[in-house]
Every structure is written in C-alpha cells, then in structure tokens.
C-alpha cells in the first residue's frame, strides 16, 4: 500500500475548482485573515503557481508572495484578481 503525504494529497485536490472553492469557503469561516491567506496561497500554488498567477494579475511574484503571506493585507481588487487567475471568484452567503 502506498502512502501519500497530506500536502501532496491537498495539492492534487486543490487542482479541482469545486474542491478549491470549498477549501477557501471553509478557511473564510475562521475569523483570522491569516487562515484565509494561507489557504489562498495553497490554492494559487496548486492552480497555476505563483509566477503564472502573478503574471495574470499584473503583480510581481514578490508582491504576490508578500500579499498572500500571513502579514499580507490585500485589497478586494487584488483578492478578486488572484481568485480570477485561479479560475475562481468571490461569493457571499447568509449565515
């Protein structure tokens, strides 16, 4: 029986848009923005990589890394562009 590391499994799952969306929705339920930014960074890495997403969003790779770090403070415009570059979009729902 072969084993797979959790991060490798997660990376493969995040390539699926529906899974990635649910993953980000779950991360957004935490009141800590760091949780969401960490999750979004994993989605970016799985769904194109930092260099590709940076190019699609007209951000430098360094800026994208900084924006998605635990100390990042991205604007709505930047978040929307990053999500779009990964094939996702913002959504809002009632509690």
For every predicted segment, state its role.
Residues 46-66:
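Short alpha-helical DNA-recognition segment
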Residues 75-93:
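DNA major-groove recognition helix of helix-turn-helix/homeodomain DNA-binding modules
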